[in-house]
Amino acid sequence: MSLMTKLGFRALVASCLITAGSAANAQVNVLITGVGSTQFPIATANFTNEANLPQQVTSIVRADLARSGKFTNIDAGSTPVPETASVDLGAWKAKGANAFVAGSVNRDANGQYKVNFILYDTVKQQSLGGLSLTATDTTLRTAGHKIADYIYQKLLGVRGVFATRLSYVIKTGNRYQLQISDSDGQNARIALSSTEPIISPAWSPSGTKVAYVSFERKKPIVYIHDLPTGRRYMVSDQKGNNSAPAWSPDSNTLAVALSLTGNTQIYTVNANGGGLRRLTQSSSIDTEPFYSPDGRWIYFTSDRGGAPQIYRMPAQGESAGAAQRVTFTGSYNTSPRVSPDGKLLAYISRTGGGFKLYVQDLQTGAANAITNTNRDESPSFAANGQYVLYATQSGGRNVLAAVPSDGSAPPQILSVQGGSVREPSWGPFMQ
């Protein structure tokens, strides 16, 4: 490795520890449009009894389907249609809809809502079933997301991710915020607010905890935040830098990057903060660990071969088997993320003076750039593997973007009002 390359990689590692985005006072609006050339035409009628609701379920369902890029919303008119109505499916097919949705929202004596809907296939002239959900004023949005997930899976054969959540870091003035939002960027909540940087949020497999790195004690320390209770606790405060937490599939362990003995190396620590164990034994920089979904491997970035590349080793560490290089396209590759099915690897590659998001088939080794942006970082797969969320630059500011993992359409910028946002992480399916 040349001195310039080594300094560049060390600068990258340092930047991962000290940057957390520019000012943002924001509602993140997620849009993934134009996915593929064929979109499924669907008509969603207004649900009955929605007029005075704090959230209109029908609007949420339509918006979810539209932003996925997989559906075209056919005008269903303004007349509400309950799930119990007799529907002329042929008429809806004639209007261009291959599917039709009807439903209702009714408030019970306890103040809760009963949300019912039914999905029809207008081509085969048959019902595809539906759901009956219970919601409150604050969970009507979740009910809408669950309905959209049901429709997505029934019509496309892939589980939807509308009811999942995002985490990201924004900065307002001199204050950093770790925020959690719905997958559409709505309903954002502040998990942590600090005058010091917050970086590297990582969701637990259960979706109930987020690990992250905070500089609030003037050095990088790894914490775990329990979202239901708001409780958080320190996991790694070793000498030097504590960074890049990654959960094991069973939620019992975190892989972390520590500079405990000098150069940054990969370690594991129990989720309760004990049981520190070193996994790599190199004289190089080893960082950015990420578990394969089956728990067998840890992927990581290392400059041991002369320049930053992605390697994988047994989850037990290099004592159980030598690390193997995984990326060979390009001379500078970082930020490994494995898809939920274990078939794809997303990473950032330095290309033509910029940094682009690549996706590699782990079986064939074929790798392709899937974005038209050139300041990409922090990739994160959706729980169904269909999309990759990442940070990039647009119009001179830091933004989030989402792109189909197969590169079938250009990335779409996630609109943030009032500033910039970084450090995205797409949460798992809700259990």
UniProtKB/Swiss-Prot annotation:
Location of region: Disordered: 406-431
Source superkingdom: Bacteria
Xref: Gene3D superfamilies: TolB, C-terminal domain, TolB, N-terminal domain
Main location: periplasm
Family: Belongs to the TolB family.
Function comment: Part of the Tol-Pal system, which plays a role in outer membrane invagination during cell division and is important for maintaining outer membrane integrity.
HAMAP family according to UniProt: TolB
Protein name: Tol-Pal system protein TolB
Lineage: Bacteria, Pseudomonadati, Pseudomonadota, Betaproteobacteria, Burkholderiales
